[in-house]
Amino acid sequence: INNSKMIIHEIKNIDQAIFKFGVIEVLEVVNLKNLPDFGLINSVSGKASYQSIISAIKLAMDNHVSAIVTSPINKESLSLANINFPGHTEILAKHSNTKDVAMMLVNNEIKILLSTIHCSLSKAIQLINFDNQISSINFAYQGAKSLGVNNPRIAVAGLNPHAGEGGLFGQEEIDFIIPAINSAKDSGIDVSGPWPSDTIFMQARKGEFDIVVAQYHDQGLIPIKYMGLENGVNITLGLPFVRTSPDHGTAYNIAGKGIADSSSFDAAITCANKLIKSKMTKI
C-alpha cells in the first residue's frame, strides 16, 4: 500500500464509505490506545481480531457489503481473550445463524472441499458418517459450480490407507463413504471414489477431476499448500454472504518486517469478486 497510488480513506461508520476504485476504506472497529508489539501472541490482538470479524459479519448481514475477505487470525490469541472458537469458519457460522457450512480451498492447480475442519484427528474420524459425506459431496458440487464448473467431476478421498483396501484397513469407506457416493450418483451428481488419498490429489491436478472431497483438515491442506500456497484461497460455503480468505496463517515470525507476500490475499479478493458475480447471475 505504501508504494501504491491507492488512497486510504479512514471512516467511523459504513455510511461514510465512498466505494470508489483506487480508494481503500478503513473502518475503525476497535480503538486500541496502545498497539501490541508485532509478532506476539496476546489477548488484546485476539479480542480485536474477533471484534473486527463480528463487525464484518454484521455489515454483510445488513447488506452493506457483498463479501468479506478476512485476514489470518491467531487462534491462540483468541483463546487468551476467552473467545472459544477454533477459527473463522465457526465464528462466521455462529454469528450468521448458519447451521451447515463447509471449507473449500482453491488455487490455480486444484479445488478441495473438507468434510471435517478444525478438530482433532480422532474427532474427525468420529464425525465421518453418511450424512456428513452426502453434505460434503453436495457442498463440493455447489462450490465448484459457483466457480464456473458447469458439471463438476467430484472425487472423494478415502479416510484410511489405500481407501480402506476393501475393509482390511478400516470400515468407514464401506459403512459411510461408498453408500453416500452411490446416493449422490443416484441424484445425478458426477462423483466417484473413495480414492486413495496418496494419489487422488495428483489425479485432480492433472485434470481428471474438478474437485476433491478430503476427509480431514491436513489431508486437504497439505496438497493445496504444496501445490500453490502463494495463490491459495479459503472459501466458506453455506453462508448467506460471500467469504474468502488467504490460505496462510499470521506468520508472526515476519510480522512488521515489510516482507510478506500479498499474492494469496490478492487471490482471495479476486475470488470473492468472482463469487459475487456468480451469485448475482442466479438472482
Walk through the language-model features, giving the residues of each:
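Contiguous, glycine/small-aliphatic-enriched amphipathic segments in soluble metabolic enzymes
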Residues: I1-H88, D131-Q215, Q219-K225, E230-N234, ...
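Acidic/polar active-site rim loop that often engages polyanionic ligands
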Residues: P72-N74, I112-S120
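Glycine/threonine-rich beta-strand-loop-alpha-helix active-site module
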Residues: L80-A102
